[in-house]
Amino acid sequence: MDPYKHRPSSAFNAPYWTTNSGAPVWNNDSSLTVGARGPILLEDYHCEKLANFDRERIPERVVHARGASAKGFFEVTHDITHLTCADFLRAPGVQTPVIVRFSTVIHERGSPETLRDPRGFAVKFYTREGNWDLVGNNFPVFFIRDGIKFPDMVHALKPNPRTHIQDNWRILDFFSHHPESLHMFSFLFDDVGIPADYRHMDGSGVHTYTLVSRAGTVTYVKFHWRPTCGVRSLMDDEAVRCGANHSHATKDLTDAIAAGNFPEWTLYIQTMDPEMEDRLDDLDPLDVTKTWPEDTFPLQPVGRLVLNRNIDNFFAENEQLAFCPGLIVPGIYYSDDKLLQTRIFSYSDTQRHRLGPNYLLLPANAPKCAHHNNHYDGSMNFMHRHEEVDYFPSRYDAVRNAPRYPIPTAHIAGRREKTVISKENNFKQPGERYRAMDPARQERFITRWVDALSDPRLTHEIRTIWLSNWSQADRSLGQKLASRLSAKPSM
Protein backbone atom coordinates (compact mmCIF):
# COMPACT_ATOMS: atom_id res chain seq x y z
CA MET A 1 0.00 0.00 0.00
CA ASP A 2 1.29 3.44 -0.95
CA PRO A 3 0.54 5.43 2.25
CA TYR A 4 0.65 8.72 0.39
CA LYS A 5 -1.74 7.83 -2.42
CA HIS A 6 -4.10 5.59 -0.43
CA ARG A 7 -4.06 2.87 -3.08
CA PRO A 8 -2.25 -0.44 -3.59
CA SER A 9 1.08 -0.24 -5.39
CA SER A 10 3.58 -2.95 -6.33
CA ALA A 11 6.31 -0.56 -5.16
CA PHE A 12 5.19 -1.33 -1.60
CA ASN A 13 4.96 -5.13 -1.90
CA ALA A 14 5.39 -7.30 1.18
CA PRO A 15 8.43 -9.63 1.14
CA TYR A 16 6.14 -12.68 1.42
CA TRP A 17 2.90 -13.91 -0.22
CA THR A 18 -0.43 -12.58 1.14
CA THR A 19 -4.15 -12.69 0.45
CA ASN A 20 -5.92 -9.70 -1.08
CA SER A 21 -6.75 -8.57 2.44
CA GLY A 22 -3.09 -8.71 3.49
CA ALA A 23 -3.07 -11.92 5.54
CA PRO A 24 0.10 -14.03 5.08
CA VAL A 25 -0.08 -17.14 2.88
CA TRP A 26 2.37 -19.72 4.18
CA ASN A 27 1.95 -22.19 1.29
CA ASN A 28 1.05 -21.08 -2.25
CA ASP A 29 1.99 -24.43 -3.80
CA SER A 30 -0.59 -26.84 -2.36
CA SER A 31 -4.33 -26.70 -1.67
CA LEU A 32 -5.65 -27.14 1.87
CA THR A 33 -7.36 -30.55 2.00
CA VAL A 34 -8.82 -32.98 4.54
CA GLY A 35 -5.87 -35.30 4.75
CA ALA A 36 -3.41 -35.90 1.95
CA ARG A 37 -6.09 -37.26 -0.46
CA GLY A 38 -9.22 -35.50 0.85
CA PRO A 39 -11.41 -32.74 -0.65
CA ILE A 40 -10.31 -29.09 -0.79
CA LEU A 41 -11.66 -26.89 1.99
CA LEU A 42 -13.60 -23.73 1.12
CA GLU A 43 -11.57 -21.86 3.73
CA ASP A 44 -8.42 -22.23 1.64
CA TYR A 45 -6.70 -19.29 -0.13
CA HIS A 46 -7.06 -21.51 -3.20
CA CYS A 47 -10.68 -20.26 -3.56
CA GLU A 48 -9.75 -16.57 -3.45
CA LYS A 49 -7.02 -17.20 -6.00
CA LEU A 50 -9.45 -18.87 -8.43
CA ALA A 51 -12.18 -16.29 -7.88
CA ASN A 52 -9.78 -13.49 -8.73
CA PHE A 53 -8.51 -15.37 -11.78
CA ASP A 54 -12.08 -15.92 -13.02
CA ARG A 55 -12.62 -12.15 -13.04
CA GLU A 56 -9.35 -10.94 -14.55
CA ARG A 57 -10.85 -10.13 -17.93
CA ILE A 58 -13.16 -7.20 -18.58
CA PRO A 59 -15.44 -6.64 -21.60
CA GLU A 60 -13.28 -5.81 -24.59
CA ARG A 61 -13.94 -2.70 -26.62
CA VAL A 62 -16.71 -3.20 -29.18
CA VAL A 63 -14.34 -1.57 -31.70
CA HIS A 64 -10.60 -0.86 -31.40
CA ALA A 65 -10.19 -3.93 -29.17
CA ARG A 66 -6.66 -4.70 -30.39
CA GLY A 67 -4.28 -1.93 -29.39
CA ALA A 68 -0.89 -0.81 -28.11
CA SER A 69 -0.07 2.19 -25.93
CA ALA A 70 2.95 4.36 -25.18
CA LYS A 71 3.67 7.52 -23.20
CA GLY A 72 5.52 10.71 -24.00
CA PHE A 73 5.00 14.43 -24.43
CA PHE A 74 3.59 17.02 -26.79
CA GLU A 75 5.65 20.17 -27.33
CA VAL A 76 4.33 23.36 -28.92
CA THR A 77 6.58 24.59 -31.74
CA HIS A 78 4.42 27.31 -33.33
CA ASP A 79 2.31 30.07 -31.79
CA ILE A 80 -1.43 29.74 -32.47
CA THR A 81 -2.69 31.88 -29.57
CA HIS A 82 -4.49 34.06 -32.11
CA LEU A 83 -6.72 31.03 -32.76
CA THR A 84 -7.15 29.42 -29.33
CA CYS A 85 -6.92 30.20 -25.63
CA ALA A 86 -6.03 26.58 -24.80
CA ASP A 87 -3.51 26.76 -21.97
CA PHE A 88 -1.33 23.88 -23.18
CA LEU A 89 -0.90 25.74 -26.51
CA ARG A 90 -0.02 29.03 -24.81
CA ALA A 91 3.53 29.36 -26.18
CA PRO A 92 6.23 27.53 -28.13
CA GLY A 93 8.28 25.27 -25.88
CA VAL A 94 5.40 24.29 -23.59
CA GLN A 95 5.35 20.53 -23.01
CA THR A 96 2.34 18.43 -21.99
CA PRO A 97 2.49 14.76 -20.92
CA VAL A 98 0.49 12.40 -23.13
CA ILE A 99 -0.47 8.77 -23.51
CA VAL A 100 -1.26 7.41 -26.98
CA ARG A 101 -3.13 4.29 -28.03
CA PHE A 102 -2.87 2.83 -31.52
CA SER A 103 -5.30 0.13 -32.57
CA THR A 104 -6.95 -1.88 -35.28
CA VAL A 105 -10.71 -1.33 -35.47
CA ILE A 106 -12.96 -4.25 -36.28
CA HIS A 107 -11.55 -7.51 -34.99
CA GLU A 108 -10.98 -8.97 -31.54
CA ARG A 109 -8.30 -8.27 -28.97
CA GLY A 110 -6.06 -11.11 -30.19
CA SER A 111 -6.46 -10.53 -33.93
CA PRO A 112 -3.45 -9.97 -36.26
CA GLU A 113 -2.12 -6.46 -36.81
CA THR A 114 -1.76 -7.11 -40.55
CA LEU A 115 -5.43 -6.95 -41.53
CA ARG A 116 -6.77 -4.44 -44.05
CA ASP A 117 -8.54 -2.29 -41.51
CA PRO A 118 -8.46 1.35 -40.38
CA ARG A 119 -6.15 2.11 -37.47
CA GLY A 120 -7.03 4.09 -34.38
CA PHE A 121 -4.78 6.97 -33.32
CA ALA A 122 -5.95 8.33 -29.95
CA VAL A 123 -4.01 10.86 -27.86
CA LYS A 124 -4.77 11.88 -24.28
CA PHE A 125 -3.22 15.22 -23.28
CA TYR A 126 -2.84 15.68 -19.51
CA THR A 127 -3.10 19.49 -19.50
CA ARG A 128 -3.17 21.96 -16.59
CA GLU A 129 -6.86 22.57 -17.36
CA GLY A 130 -7.94 18.94 -17.56
CA ASN A 131 -7.58 16.12 -20.06
CA TRP A 132 -8.10 16.61 -23.78
CA ASP A 133 -8.72 13.48 -25.84
CA LEU A 134 -8.04 13.71 -29.58
CA VAL A 135 -9.58 10.43 -30.69
CA GLY A 136 -8.90 9.79 -34.35
CA ASN A 137 -7.84 7.32 -37.03
CA ASN A 138 -5.05 6.99 -39.56
CA PHE A 139 -7.38 8.09 -42.39
CA PRO A 140 -8.76 11.65 -42.56
CA VAL A 141 -12.33 10.59 -43.47
CA PHE A 142 -14.92 8.06 -42.30
CA PHE A 143 -17.45 5.64 -43.81
CA ILE A 144 -20.66 7.42 -42.74
CA ARG A 145 -21.64 10.95 -41.80
CA ASP A 146 -24.58 10.36 -39.45
CA GLY A 147 -23.99 8.58 -36.15
CA ILE A 148 -27.42 6.92 -36.16
CA LYS A 149 -25.92 4.45 -38.66
CA PHE A 150 -22.86 3.66 -36.53
CA PRO A 151 -24.23 0.47 -34.87
CA ASP A 152 -25.39 -0.89 -38.24
CA MET A 153 -22.04 -0.05 -39.83
CA VAL A 154 -20.10 -1.86 -37.11
CA HIS A 155 -22.43 -4.88 -37.32
CA ALA A 156 -21.84 -5.06 -41.08
CA LEU A 157 -18.06 -4.86 -40.71
CA LYS A 158 -17.93 -7.33 -37.84
CA PRO A 159 -17.97 -11.10 -38.44
CA ASN A 160 -21.21 -12.77 -39.48
CA PRO A 161 -23.21 -13.46 -36.28
CA ARG A 162 -23.98 -16.98 -37.46
CA THR A 163 -20.50 -18.09 -38.57
CA HIS A 164 -18.22 -15.49 -36.93
CA ILE A 165 -16.50 -14.94 -40.28
CA GLN A 166 -16.13 -11.48 -41.81
CA ASP A 167 -17.97 -11.55 -45.16
CA ASN A 168 -17.48 -9.17 -48.08
CA TRP A 169 -21.11 -9.64 -49.16
CA ARG A 170 -22.38 -8.24 -45.84
CA ILE A 171 -20.02 -5.26 -45.99
CA LEU A 172 -20.82 -4.44 -49.61
CA ASP A 173 -24.54 -4.88 -49.04
CA PHE A 174 -24.60 -2.34 -46.22
CA PHE A 175 -22.37 0.23 -47.88
CA SER A 176 -24.24 -0.05 -51.20
CA HIS A 177 -26.85 2.04 -49.37
CA HIS A 178 -24.20 4.60 -48.38
CA PRO A 179 -22.30 6.01 -51.37
CA GLU A 180 -20.66 8.54 -49.03
CA SER A 181 -18.42 5.62 -47.98
CA LEU A 182 -16.57 5.63 -51.33
CA HIS A 183 -13.99 8.15 -50.13
CA MET A 184 -13.10 6.00 -47.12
CA PHE A 185 -12.87 2.92 -49.32
CA SER A 186 -10.52 4.80 -51.65
CA PHE A 187 -8.10 4.82 -48.69
CA LEU A 188 -8.86 1.38 -47.28
CA PHE A 189 -8.42 -0.50 -50.59
CA ASP A 190 -5.40 1.59 -51.54
CA ASP A 191 -1.81 0.66 -50.70
CA VAL A 192 -2.12 2.60 -47.41
CA GLY A 193 -4.85 0.19 -46.24
CA ILE A 194 -2.37 -1.89 -44.22
CA PRO A 195 0.13 0.28 -42.29
CA ALA A 196 3.56 -1.32 -41.90
CA ASP A 197 3.49 -0.50 -38.18
CA TYR A 198 2.28 2.24 -35.85
CA ARG A 199 5.44 4.38 -36.06
CA HIS A 200 5.12 4.92 -39.81
CA MET A 201 1.45 5.90 -39.82
CA ASP A 202 -0.46 9.15 -40.30
CA GLY A 203 -3.08 10.23 -37.82
CA SER A 204 -6.12 12.45 -38.10
CA GLY A 205 -8.74 13.91 -35.80
CA VAL A 206 -11.14 13.09 -38.69
CA HIS A 207 -13.87 15.46 -37.47
CA THR A 208 -14.10 19.22 -37.68
CA TYR A 209 -13.58 20.82 -34.29
CA THR A 210 -13.69 24.44 -33.18
CA LEU A 211 -10.92 26.64 -31.83
CA VAL A 212 -11.95 29.58 -29.64
CA SER A 213 -9.62 32.52 -29.00
CA ARG A 214 -9.41 34.60 -25.84
CA ALA A 215 -11.49 37.25 -27.62
CA GLY A 216 -14.17 34.67 -28.45
CA THR A 217 -13.32 34.35 -32.16
CA VAL A 218 -14.38 30.96 -33.50
CA THR A 219 -12.43 29.00 -36.13
CA TYR A 220 -13.18 25.59 -37.62
CA VAL A 221 -10.18 23.25 -37.36
CA LYS A 222 -9.04 19.82 -38.50
CA PHE A 223 -6.11 18.07 -36.79
CA HIS A 224 -3.50 15.96 -38.59
CA TRP A 225 -0.51 13.93 -37.37
CA ARG A 226 2.41 13.29 -39.74
CA PRO A 227 5.22 10.88 -38.74
CA THR A 228 8.67 12.43 -39.05
CA CYS A 229 10.04 9.07 -40.25
CA GLY A 230 7.53 8.93 -43.12
CA VAL A 231 4.61 6.67 -43.98
CA ARG A 232 5.15 2.99 -44.74
CA SER A 233 2.56 0.41 -45.71
CA LEU A 234 2.46 -3.32 -46.37
CA MET A 235 1.58 -4.75 -49.75
CA ASP A 236 -0.78 -7.72 -49.64
CA ASP A 237 1.97 -10.35 -49.94
CA GLU A 238 4.09 -8.57 -47.32
CA ALA A 239 1.15 -8.57 -44.92
CA VAL A 240 0.79 -12.34 -45.33
CA ARG A 241 4.47 -12.88 -44.51
CA CYS A 242 4.43 -10.38 -41.67
CA GLY A 243 1.35 -12.06 -40.23
CA ALA A 244 3.55 -14.88 -38.94
CA ASN A 245 3.99 -12.54 -35.96
CA HIS A 246 0.45 -11.40 -35.23
CA SER A 247 1.76 -8.70 -32.82
CA HIS A 248 4.39 -7.25 -35.15
CA ALA A 249 3.25 -3.62 -34.82
CA THR A 250 3.06 -3.74 -31.03
CA LYS A 251 6.52 -5.32 -30.87
CA ASP A 252 7.94 -2.75 -33.29
CA LEU A 253 6.62 0.14 -31.18
CA THR A 254 7.82 -1.36 -27.89
CA ASP A 255 11.26 -2.31 -29.22
CA ALA A 256 11.84 1.08 -30.87
CA ILE A 257 11.09 2.99 -27.67
CA ALA A 258 13.18 0.59 -25.56
CA ALA A 259 16.12 1.15 -27.94
CA GLY A 260 15.81 4.94 -27.68
CA ASN A 261 14.48 5.28 -31.23
CA PHE A 262 11.56 7.42 -30.12
CA PRO A 263 8.65 7.76 -32.59
CA GLU A 264 7.73 11.34 -33.40
CA TRP A 265 4.87 13.05 -35.21
CA THR A 266 4.24 16.66 -36.20
CA LEU A 267 0.79 18.07 -35.44
CA TYR A 268 -0.68 20.18 -38.23
CA ILE A 269 -3.99 21.99 -38.38
CA GLN A 270 -6.21 23.20 -41.19
CA THR A 271 -8.39 26.17 -40.31
CA MET A 272 -11.49 27.76 -41.81
CA ASP A 273 -13.58 30.80 -40.95
CA PRO A 274 -17.13 29.48 -40.33
CA GLU A 275 -18.49 32.40 -42.34
CA MET A 276 -16.79 30.92 -45.39
CA GLU A 277 -19.02 27.84 -45.19
CA ASP A 278 -21.80 29.24 -47.37
CA ARG A 279 -19.31 30.18 -50.09
CA LEU A 280 -18.17 26.58 -50.57
CA ASP A 281 -20.14 25.25 -53.54
CA ASP A 282 -19.46 21.53 -53.18
CA LEU A 283 -18.12 21.03 -49.65
CA ASP A 284 -19.79 20.93 -46.27
CA PRO A 285 -16.94 21.55 -43.77
CA LEU A 286 -18.72 19.40 -41.17
CA ASP A 287 -18.98 16.40 -43.52
CA VAL A 288 -16.74 13.71 -42.03
CA THR A 289 -16.59 11.86 -45.37
CA LYS A 290 -14.69 14.74 -47.01
CA THR A 291 -11.23 16.26 -46.75
CA TRP A 292 -10.48 19.96 -46.99
CA PRO A 293 -8.32 20.71 -50.05
CA GLU A 294 -4.83 21.65 -48.85
CA ASP A 295 -4.30 24.22 -51.60
CA THR A 296 -7.21 26.23 -50.16
CA PHE A 297 -6.76 25.27 -46.50
CA PRO A 298 -3.01 24.66 -46.06
CA LEU A 299 -1.48 22.59 -43.28
CA GLN A 300 -0.10 24.74 -40.46
CA PRO A 301 2.41 23.22 -38.00
CA VAL A 302 1.57 23.42 -34.29
CA GLY A 303 3.84 21.06 -32.37
CA ARG A 304 5.48 17.69 -32.07
CA LEU A 305 4.47 14.46 -30.36
CA VAL A 306 7.28 12.28 -28.99
CA LEU A 307 6.73 8.82 -27.47
CA ASN A 308 9.68 8.10 -25.17
CA ARG A 309 8.29 5.68 -22.56
CA ASN A 310 6.73 2.27 -22.82
CA ILE A 311 3.76 1.60 -20.57
CA ASP A 312 4.39 -0.09 -17.23
CA ASN A 313 1.40 -2.43 -17.31
CA PHE A 314 -0.66 -3.48 -20.33
CA PHE A 315 -3.93 -3.92 -18.47
CA ALA A 316 -3.73 -0.68 -16.47
CA GLU A 317 -2.50 1.53 -19.30
CA ASN A 318 -4.01 -0.06 -22.39
CA GLU A 319 -7.07 -2.12 -21.50
CA GLN A 320 -8.25 0.32 -18.81
CA LEU A 321 -7.18 3.36 -20.82
CA ALA A 322 -10.36 5.15 -21.93
CA PHE A 323 -10.80 7.89 -24.53
CA CYS A 324 -13.77 10.10 -25.30
CA PRO A 325 -14.10 12.93 -27.86
CA GLY A 326 -16.28 14.67 -25.27
CA LEU A 327 -13.23 15.43 -23.12
CA ILE A 328 -12.16 18.93 -24.14
CA VAL A 329 -10.42 21.89 -22.52
CA PRO A 330 -11.04 25.66 -22.75
CA GLY A 331 -10.10 26.93 -26.19
CA ILE A 332 -11.11 23.72 -28.02
CA TYR A 333 -14.75 22.92 -28.71
CA TYR A 334 -16.93 20.59 -30.73
CA SER A 335 -18.70 21.24 -34.01
CA ASP A 336 -22.16 20.16 -35.16
CA ASP A 337 -20.75 17.22 -37.13
CA LYS A 338 -23.45 14.57 -36.58
CA LEU A 339 -20.98 11.72 -36.16
CA LEU A 340 -18.92 13.70 -33.65
CA GLN A 341 -22.04 14.48 -31.66
CA THR A 342 -22.81 10.75 -31.56
CA ARG A 343 -19.30 9.86 -30.41
CA ILE A 344 -19.43 12.42 -27.58
CA PHE A 345 -22.21 10.35 -26.00
CA SER A 346 -21.28 6.86 -27.13
CA TYR A 347 -17.65 6.79 -26.03
CA SER A 348 -18.26 7.82 -22.42
CA ASP A 349 -21.27 5.49 -22.29
CA THR A 350 -19.27 2.48 -23.46
CA GLN A 351 -16.47 3.23 -20.99
CA ARG A 352 -18.97 3.23 -18.12
CA HIS A 353 -20.21 -0.16 -19.32
CA ARG A 354 -16.71 -1.55 -19.86
CA LEU A 355 -14.90 -0.10 -16.84
CA GLY A 356 -17.61 1.18 -14.51
CA PRO A 357 -19.04 4.59 -13.58
CA ASN A 358 -15.79 5.73 -11.97
CA TYR A 359 -13.50 4.96 -14.91
CA LEU A 360 -12.11 8.51 -14.79
CA LEU A 361 -10.61 7.73 -11.37
CA LEU A 362 -8.35 5.06 -12.86
CA PRO A 363 -4.75 6.36 -12.95
CA ALA A 364 -4.42 6.30 -16.75
CA ASN A 365 -7.65 8.28 -17.16
CA ALA A 366 -7.53 10.65 -14.20
CA PRO A 367 -6.45 14.26 -14.78
CA LYS A 368 -2.99 15.19 -13.52
CA CYS A 369 -4.18 18.65 -12.48
CA ALA A 370 -6.14 19.54 -9.34
CA HIS A 371 -9.87 18.95 -9.78
CA HIS A 372 -12.99 19.26 -7.64
CA ASN A 373 -16.66 18.33 -7.99
CA ASN A 374 -19.44 16.58 -6.10
CA HIS A 375 -19.52 13.35 -8.08
CA TYR A 376 -19.62 10.94 -5.18
CA ASP A 377 -19.61 7.21 -4.56
CA GLY A 378 -20.70 4.64 -7.15
CA SER A 379 -19.18 1.26 -7.90
CA MET A 380 -15.42 1.02 -7.26
CA ASN A 381 -14.99 4.63 -6.16
CA PHE A 382 -11.58 4.66 -4.45
CA MET A 383 -11.02 8.42 -4.22
CA HIS A 384 -10.02 9.47 -0.70
CA ARG A 385 -12.47 12.18 0.45
CA HIS A 386 -13.23 13.70 3.84
CA GLU A 387 -15.53 16.65 3.03
CA GLU A 388 -18.75 17.25 4.94
CA VAL A 389 -20.31 19.40 2.22
CA ASP A 390 -21.28 17.45 -0.91
CA TYR A 391 -23.49 20.09 -2.54
CA PHE A 392 -23.00 23.43 -4.28
CA PRO A 393 -23.07 26.27 -3.41
CA SER A 394 -22.35 26.40 0.32
CA ARG A 395 -21.21 29.03 2.77
CA TYR A 396 -19.20 26.32 4.56
CA ASP A 397 -17.12 25.49 1.48
CA ALA A 398 -15.14 28.18 -0.31
CA VAL A 399 -15.15 26.40 -3.67
CA ARG A 400 -16.51 28.59 -6.47
CA ASN A 401 -17.18 28.48 -10.18
CA ALA A 402 -14.08 28.52 -12.36
CA PRO A 403 -13.18 31.73 -14.22
CA ARG A 404 -15.31 32.11 -17.30
CA TYR A 405 -13.79 31.17 -20.62
CA PRO A 406 -15.17 31.78 -24.15
CA ILE A 407 -17.28 29.20 -25.97
CA PRO A 408 -18.95 29.41 -29.40
CA THR A 409 -22.13 31.49 -29.29
CA ALA A 410 -23.59 30.94 -32.75
CA HIS A 411 -27.36 31.35 -32.99
CA ILE A 412 -29.07 28.13 -34.11
CA ALA A 413 -32.69 27.96 -35.23
CA GLY A 414 -34.67 25.42 -37.23
CA ARG A 415 -37.37 22.79 -37.27
CA ARG A 416 -37.03 19.30 -35.87
CA GLU A 417 -36.23 17.11 -38.87
CA LYS A 418 -34.36 14.01 -40.00
CA THR A 419 -32.49 14.74 -43.20
CA VAL A 420 -29.19 14.43 -45.05
CA ILE A 421 -26.84 17.31 -45.75
CA SER A 422 -27.48 19.37 -48.87
CA LYS A 423 -23.93 19.09 -50.26
CA GLU A 424 -23.48 15.32 -50.44
CA ASN A 425 -21.18 15.24 -53.49
CA ASN A 426 -20.18 11.64 -52.80
CA PHE A 427 -18.12 10.94 -55.90
CA LYS A 428 -15.79 13.89 -56.61
CA GLN A 429 -13.11 13.32 -53.97
CA PRO A 430 -12.90 9.51 -54.38
CA GLY A 431 -12.42 10.03 -58.12
CA GLU A 432 -9.73 12.66 -57.57
CA ARG A 433 -7.91 10.36 -55.21
CA TYR A 434 -8.00 7.46 -57.66
CA ARG A 435 -6.72 9.62 -60.52
CA ALA A 436 -3.82 10.82 -58.33
CA MET A 437 -2.50 7.23 -58.08
CA ASP A 438 0.16 6.05 -60.49
CA PRO A 439 -0.89 3.26 -62.92
CA ALA A 440 0.63 0.44 -60.85
CA ARG A 441 -1.13 1.66 -57.73
CA GLN A 442 -4.41 1.95 -59.64
CA GLU A 443 -3.99 -1.63 -60.80
CA ARG A 444 -3.55 -2.89 -57.24
CA PHE A 445 -6.61 -0.88 -56.17
CA ILE A 446 -8.68 -2.46 -58.97
CA THR A 447 -7.43 -5.97 -58.13
CA ARG A 448 -8.55 -5.61 -54.51
CA TRP A 449 -11.98 -4.40 -55.57
CA VAL A 450 -12.41 -7.18 -58.12
CA ASP A 451 -11.64 -9.66 -55.36
CA ALA A 452 -14.22 -8.09 -53.02
CA LEU A 453 -16.90 -7.81 -55.71
CA SER A 454 -16.35 -11.45 -56.71
CA ASP A 455 -17.86 -12.74 -53.48
CA PRO A 456 -20.20 -15.53 -54.68
CA ARG A 457 -22.98 -14.43 -52.32
CA LEU A 458 -23.00 -10.88 -53.69
CA THR A 459 -26.13 -10.29 -55.75
CA HIS A 460 -26.12 -8.82 -59.25
CA GLU A 461 -28.05 -5.81 -57.92
CA ILE A 462 -25.45 -4.96 -55.28
CA ARG A 463 -22.55 -5.51 -57.67
CA THR A 464 -24.23 -3.22 -60.21
CA ILE A 465 -24.67 -0.48 -57.59
CA TRP A 466 -20.96 -0.60 -56.77
CA LEU A 467 -19.98 -0.47 -60.43
CA SER A 468 -22.26 2.52 -60.86
CA ASN A 469 -20.79 4.27 -57.82
CA TRP A 470 -17.20 3.79 -58.93
CA SER A 471 -18.12 4.80 -62.47
CA GLN A 472 -19.52 8.06 -61.12
CA ALA A 473 -16.25 8.60 -59.26
CA ASP A 474 -14.16 7.80 -62.35
CA ARG A 475 -15.58 6.42 -65.59
CA SER A 476 -12.45 4.47 -66.54
CA LEU A 477 -12.34 2.86 -63.08
CA GLY A 478 -15.92 1.67 -63.44
CA GLN A 479 -15.21 0.32 -66.91
CA LYS A 480 -12.11 -1.58 -65.77
CA LEU A 481 -13.95 -3.11 -62.84
CA ALA A 482 -16.84 -4.11 -65.08
CA SER A 483 -14.50 -5.62 -67.64
CA ARG A 484 -12.74 -7.71 -65.00
CA LEU A 485 -16.08 -8.84 -63.62
CA SER A 486 -17.52 -9.50 -67.11
CA ALA A 487 -20.25 -6.97 -66.45
CA LYS A 488 -21.27 -3.63 -67.91
CA PRO A 489 -21.11 -0.51 -65.72
CA SER A 490 -24.45 1.08 -65.03
CA MET A 491 -24.58 4.87 -65.08
Curated annotation (Swiss-Prot):
PANTHER family (UniProt xref): CATALASE, CATALASE-2
Organism field: Zea mays
Cofactor: heme
Protein name: Catalase isozyme 2
Oligomeric and partner information: Homotetramer.
A molecular function (GO) term: catalase activity
Subcellular location, record wording: Cytoplasm, Cytosol; Peroxisome matrix
Native organism taxonomy: Eukaryota, Viridiplantae, Streptophyta, Embryophyta, Tracheophyta
SUPFAM superfamilies: Heme-dependent catalase-like
